[in-house]
From Swiss-Prot:
Keywords: Amidation, Amphibian defense peptide, Secreted. It comes from Rana temporaria (European common frog). One of its GO terms (biological process) is defense response. InterPro entries: Melittin/Api_allergen. This is Melittin-like peptide.
Length: 22
């Protein structure tokens, strides 16, 4: 469970970072 959650987080993180830096 933790591993899949980290995978999802790692996949979403770049989008969040780019949205914050917008």
């Amino acid at each position: 469970f933790i591993g899949s959650a980290l995978k999802v987080l790692a996949g979403v993180l770049p989008s969040i970072v780019s949205w914050v830096k917008q």
